[in-house]
Amino acid sequence: MTTLNVARVYLRVSSEDQDLQRQEAIIGNARESGYYVAAVYREKASGARSDRPELLRMIEDLQPGEVVIAEKIDRISRLPLVEAEKLVDAIRAKGARLAVPGIVDLSQLTEASRGVAKVVLQGVQDMLLRVALQIARDDFEDRRERQRQGIDLAKGAGRYAGRKPDTKMHERVIALKSGGCSIAETARLAGVSVSQVKRVWAQNQTKDKV
């Protein structure tokens, strides 16, 4: 009897002006590898946030035996290690596993092993994952520090004008919320976090009162 390998694909970029197109090839690659792609979750939000609507929806949708596929581990998380491990635990708690390039998957060997060998293989798998998650976080911190240094230099030279607001995202959030969508539904449809919806909506309400 043939076993159906089911995958859920998670695609993420950090901001609204970035394009997910480059990651779309993952879907075709997964199918060519023999996976049935149950759903694709596309998100434009920082990997350093844990309240990403599409990520949370994917975890909610996961079924036992399914596989989460992403381009790299930093697409799943750039969170601090403790929070990142909680995120991975939430995926594993649904009976699913990660399939991400750069991380050796020992799950099948672990399942087939017994006793000490099983414990050792599981320990190695967890260690490799922790290292990858920490590298993803370190890269995020390094980028943020370089950005801060660049801003400081630009301010010193009188060239820094501040970050421009994402007007398209703001307009989409306001339109959805004004149309009667809840905060959570607006976040999901707009592909942003709940906190972003609250902030944009609060700014809009304040502006209307002025």
From Swiss-Prot:
Q: Which family does it belong to?
A: Belongs to the site-specific recombinase resolvase family.
| UniProt organism field | Pseudomonas syringae pv. tomato
Q: Which GO terms label this protein's molecular function in UniProt?
A: DNA binding; DNA strand exchange activity
**Gene3D superfamilies recorded:** Resolvase, N-terminal catalytic domain (3.40.50.1390)
Coiled coil residues, start to end: none
For the Resolvase/invertase-type recombinase catalytic domain, which residue ranges apply? 6-150
The entry's active site is 14 (o-(5'-phospho-dna)-serine intermediate)
Relate the protein's function as given in its record: Site-specific recombination protein.
**Which residue ranges hold the DNA-binding region?**
191-210
Q: Which InterPro entries match?
A: Recombinase_CS (IPR006118), Resolv_N (IPR006119), Resolvase-like_N_sf (IPR036162), Resolvase_HTH_dom (IPR006120), SSR_resolvase (IPR050639)
Superkingdom assignment: Bacteria
Q: Which UniProt keywords apply?
A: DNA integration, DNA recombination, DNA-binding, Plasmid
Name-wise, this protein is Resolvase
Keyword Transcription regulation: yes or no? no
Corresponding gene?
stbA
One BP annotation, GO? DNA integration
